[in-house]
Design a protein with these regions (language model features):
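Conserved N-terminal/central alpha/beta ligand/cofactor-binding core
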Residues: 42, 62, 68-69, 73-143, ...
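Amphipathic alpha-helical scaffolding segments comprising HEAT/armadillo-like alpha-solenoid repeats
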Residues: 751-764, 781-793, 813-837, 860-874, ...
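Beta1/beta-strand and adjacent pyrophosphate-binding region of the FAD-binding site
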Residues: 42-53, 393-405
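Bacterial N-terminal signal peptides
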Residues: 8-20
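N-terminal Rossmann-fold NAD(P) dinucleotide-binding loop
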Residues: 56, 408
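Bacterial N-terminal signal peptides that target proteins for export
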Residues: 1-9
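Flavin (FAD/FMN)-binding glycine-rich loop and adjacent Rossmann-like elements that form
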Residues: 24-27, 32-33, 38, 82, ...
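Structural detector for internal amphipathic alpha-helices that build alpha-solenoid repeat scaffolds
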Residues: 769-782, 790-794, 798-814, 834-860, ...
Length: 988
């Protein structure tokens, strides 16, 4: 009998082990591995607060006031996520603010979102708390003692570590505590209660939905209040995963959206049903923030961590009281003080590391991401090593679209309509990009046919609309049209998700790494469509890209608009913003709240007109556009003019200004293919083209049609099982012709290049007549340059000789240097050009500017004297184009004899001191209003002159000093340019 029992026990144990092994194996199937790596440290602090809620801000402020060094990572592009995200902007009867911060927030109730966001910004700035927007915690750091030692966060600059003694988790669902291994109650399957606010429109009714009209009207800038409806919904949930919440969000919008609405909650509100297990538990009523035991906010068996939110170990009735903003802020102050006190008693964490173990991966490959850091120093950041570890798979689809904007939403719709299992990821909480979230709700130009026409007709199909200030389409309706069409086509939509890496095997992209409010994971896909507008996924996957660098700061102007509730078209151009730089984006949001402080709200999408671009299988140039080049693989017809929002750099435009005439442009499929990578397509501003070609192919109608084409192409890849380069292009074109995206002639088009040599020769002959035919001459330099040299030698007039010398010089040819030198010497300064963003057309160099640049590029010894004579005549009142011209010319010559003259120019009154190295300078030196050229003119002039001085050998360290100041500038393009210039010389 004893033996029998032993056998039973052994058998049972074996079965249990097998079951456990099976579960483990199943878990391992749902992961991939990332190789060992070193993560840059962004901040070393006493206390890190994760989450930009009112409570989180109150905690950060109090901790700082108690002497702690504090950093706050906000998930959204603003602070006040607990108020503005779910639209809980009002106080309930009997709630009265008592603290200074609370009184500022609720000067009126409901509070305007701008009032909330700006007040919280100022609270952190005044307290000396560093903070960033758009940052998701992805991992928890630990030290040798196993103690929590900070977090790892992901944002559009990649992934960075924050070392800290104490962590305050102010996220809605205690995501950091979950990462740290804290124990939580179950999130049961079944129906759960959520709330959603809709402003304007009629009350919706139905099953599992109740509505009440909010007693207080939503205040509108310069107008009457708007009525808000609070919906209470019961929605079936499979579990507490992010995917389940993403699905619930779509169900809630299906049930509550109305054509008359003007705004709505960004996310659902729920009292979390799955609290953590704390050191202590509160089962009764809420005793008040000043009386509650602090141990209910400390996870059991986890030190140095506070949970500041509804997942605390308190009754759900108490949690409801806690999540009211006044109580949350009071509690935040208590927790902030406790965290500061705890940090004071702790030594700094030692041997900080990122825990984790490798898994048996479901597929081979590795995670690629940006680990360059976000600092403004010239030294390498310290780093934290992490061993090889598993990254969970959050989903597997046919097509994943990263970015639901102008190109991404159409790509998702078309891919899903073609039968591909499609997932669209979007960081913001609305689809459509610059035309909706960016408030640029009018077409300037574009090919308004095909899918774009379907969009416009779909929006009109919602019915009559009110007239709005600024005109344009109804952004709420356009967002909803995209969303509903994705839903109809069977696509999934995940809002609040950031693409932060690529999963790659060899040269094939097999998925995208994402950061969600609940953590980091991988979406595996047969095709990735990078619709970030910034080639974010392609860049980290290994695609070669072009952007501002050491060559210059030529970038189209950017904006960030004020938002008036129910408004129409709102276009701004007041700065440069680098989408890849989380510090610069933070600067823009903080400054914009100062610029537009009296309006209802601020837009959440940075309206950049130029971003990082891939080097694709084909790189479109201005010459392709000007010569109406055709291709066998055209998939988009673009229509626009050269609306450059700044200055141009291509030789053709430095010689002959672009005009405002309408141009139709063929865009080939190869512009969407990153050279050397498979499994990925890139859309929007990230496609492969010269920066001076982008103004003509970036119009919204054309990006919408381009996204549609990319989605169809991706579905064809899935169906055929081939690579992105092997699809049947003619079949794709036929579909697009049937859709009316393309004219039928593209089916028989061939590449019209190379141009016949006879055409080049004819153009060289007539180019002396006001540069007629210049676009043909510059299309094939290998054929044109010998002809230009001969034409210069044979020219029988000074005008012709100068024209040929001018072109040759601009191309770096020394032939004709003496002619150019004489022309520069004999002319007085003409009318120059100051930086212009909005409405910039034509030349951005004067005629003399252009001659000076051409002379400098000859690298002739004859060039220096005439150019230095011109430098002496310049001062702070001189136009930017003159300063830019002499800087380009002199740095090209690189003669140390030019250094003293450049230094003397820089020392003239008003030339230097224009870097924004702290946020106070950025806030108060940026003028109010939707446009600004003053600060850009000042900084561009100072920077190009300092760069030229530095490259000419410098003089008494003046150039290096200025460049080092700009290397710390909060404006990302200036900072990267300055750092690159300094690094390039150091490397040499």
């Amino acid at each position: 009998m004893k033996r029998f029992v032993e056998l039973i026990l052994v058998g049972t144990l074996i079965c249990l082990l097998l079951v456990q092994a099976g579960c483990l194996e199943e878990a391992q199937k749902r992961a991939v591995n990332e190789s060992a790596r070193d993560i840059p440290v962004a901040y070393d602090v006493d206390v890190v607060v994760v989450g930009g809620t009112t409570g989180g801000v109150a905690a950060a402020v109090e901790a700082a006031q108690q002497g702690a060094k504090v950093f706050l990572a906000a998930q959204r592009p603003y602070l006040g996520a607990d108020l503005c995200g779910p639209y809980r902007l009002w106080l309930e009867p009997g709630e009265k603010p008592t603290s200074l911060l609370a009184r500022k927030l609720f000067m009126q109730s409901p509070a305007m979102p701008m009032q909330v966001k700006r007040t919280l910004d100022e609270a952190l700035l005044e307290a000396g708390v560093e903070f960033l927007f758009g940052c998701y915690a992805t991992d928890v750091l630990r030290d040798d003692d196993g103690r929590i030692a900070g977090i790892v966060m992901a944002n559009r600059s990649g992934r960075q570590a924050v070392r800290a003694k104490v962590v305050i988790d102010a996220t809605p669902r205690a995501s950091v505590a979950r990462m740290a291994g804290a124990t939580f109650g179950p999130y049961s399957e079944g129906k759960h209660t959520f709330k959603r606010i809709v402003v304007g429109g009629e009350v919706r009714t139905g099953t599992d939905i109740q509505a009440r009209k909010v007693p207080s009207l939503i205040q509108v800038t310069g107008g009457s209040g708007r009525e808000a409806i609070e919906y209470t919904l019961k929605i079936s949930m499979k579990d507490g995963s992010f995917e389940s919440f993403a699905q619930a969000e779509q169900i809630a919008r299906d049930k509550t959206w109305h054509p008359g609405q003007v705004d709505a909650s960004e996310r659902l509100f729920q009292i979390p049903p799955d609290p953590m297990k704390g050191k202590k538990s509160l089962s009764g009523v809420w005793p008040g923030a000043d009386k509650v035991d602090m141990d209910v906010f400390r996870p059991r068996d986890t030190k140095c961590l506070f949970v500041l939110g509804g997942c605390a170990d308190i009754s759900r009735e108490a949690a409801e009281k806690l999540l009211r903003p006044l109580e949350l802020m009071k509690l935040g102050s208590r927790i902030g003080a406790a965290a500061a006190s705890e940090a004071q008693g702790l030594s700094g964490p030692r041997n900080v590391r990122l825990g984790g173990r490798a898994a048996v991966p479901v597929t081979a490959g590795d995670v690629r991401e940006n680990l360059s850091g976000i600092g403004r120093t010239l030294t390498e950041p310290s780093r934290i090593h992490t061993d090889k570890q598993a990254v969970p798979i959050l989903g597997e689809v046919n097509v994943v679209v990263v970015g639901g904007g102008t190109g991404g939403a159409p790509a998702g719709i078309s891919a899903a309509r073609q039968g591909a299992k499609t997932l669209v990821l979007e960081y913001l909480h609305g689809l459509g990009g610059v035309g909706t979230m960016g408030l640029i709700s009018k077409y300037y130009y574009g090919y308004i046919k095909g899918f774009t026409k379907e969009i416009d007709e779909g929006i009109a199909g919602f019915g009559a609309d009110v007239k709005r200030e600024g005109g344009g389409w109804n952004i709420e309706r356009k967002k909803e049209w995209y969303r509903s069409e994705l839903r109809k086509a069977g696509a999934d939509i995940w809002f609040g998700v950031l693409g932060c890496g690529a999963f790659v095997e060899g040269g094939r992209v097999k998925g995208v790494v994402v950061a969600t409010p609940e953590g980091r994971g991988v979406i595996l896909a047969k095709v990735v469509i990078d619709s970030t507008g910034n080639a974010d996924i392609a860049a980290v996957a290994g695609a070669k890209c072009t952007y501002t660098n050491g060559a210059g700061v030529a970038v189209q102007g950017a904006g960030l608009p004020p938002y008036k509730l129910g408004t129409g078209y709102t276009n701004t151009d007041w700065t440069f913003i680098d989408d890849t730089d989380v510090v610069d984006v933070w600067r823009a949001f903080v400054v914009a709240k100062e610029k537009f402080k009296d309006v209802y709200d601020l837009g959440q999408l940075v309206d950049t007109r130029e971003r990082r671009r891939i080097v694709g299988d084909f790189v479109m140039s201005p010459m392709d556009i000007s010569n109406n080049r055709t291709y066998p693989d055209t998939i988009v017809i673009a229509r626009s003019n050269f609306d450059s929002h700044g200055f141009t750099i291509h030789p053709v435009f430095m010689l002959k200004p672009p005009d405002r005439k309408e141009i139709y442009v063929n865009v080939p499929y190869r512009c969407l293919l990153p050279k050397g990578l498979d499994g990925i397509l890139v859309t929007g501003l990230g496609v492969s083209a010269h920066r001076d070609a982008m103004p003509v192919i970036r119009m919204q109608p054309d990006i919408q049609n381009q996204g549609y084409a990319a989605g169809v192409a991706a579905a064809m890849v899935v169906e055929s099982g081939k690579s992105v380069r092997q699809i049947d292009i003619k079949a794709l074109q036929k579909h697009l012709v049937e859709k009316d995206n393309l004219p039928e002639r593209v089916l028989t088009d061939k590449d019209s290049f190379p141009l016949p040599k006879e055409k080049i020769a004819q153009a060289v002959e007539r180019v002396v007549n006001n540069f007629d035919g210049l676009e043909v001459v510059l299309a094939q330099l290998q054929d044109a340059i010998p002809l230009l040299r001969r034409a210069y030698e044979a020219a029988d007039s000074e005008k012709a000789k100068l024209a040929y010398a001018h072109i040759l010089g601009m191309l770096g040819e020394p032939t004709g240097a003496d002619t150019l030198a004489e022309a520069v010497k004999s002319r007085d300064w003409d009318k120059g050009w100051n930086y212009t963003g909005m409405g910039q057309y034509g030349m951005s160099l004067s005629e003399l500017d252009s001659l000076i640049v051409a002379l400098g590029r000859t690298r002739s010894k004859q060039a220096l004297g005439p150019i230095l004579e011109k430098v002496k005549q310049l001062d702070a009142g001189s136009e930017f184009s003159h300063c830019r011209a002499v800087a380009i010319a002199l740095e090209t010559l690189g003669d140390t004899a030019a250094a003293k003259s450049l230094a003397e120019f820089l020392e003239k009154p008003g030339i230097t001191g224009h870097a924004f190295i702290d946020i106070d300078a950025a806030r108060h030196r940026t003028p109010p209003g939707p446009e600004d050229t003053l600060t850009r003119n000042q900084s561009l002039r100072e920077l190009v002159l300092a760069r030229a001085l530095y490259r000419c050998g410098d003089y008494e360290g003046i150039g290096e000093k200025i460049l080092k100041e700009y290397a710390r500038d909060l404006r990302g393009h200036y900072a990267r340019h300055a750092r690159t210039v300094l690094k390039d010389k150091k490397d040499k």
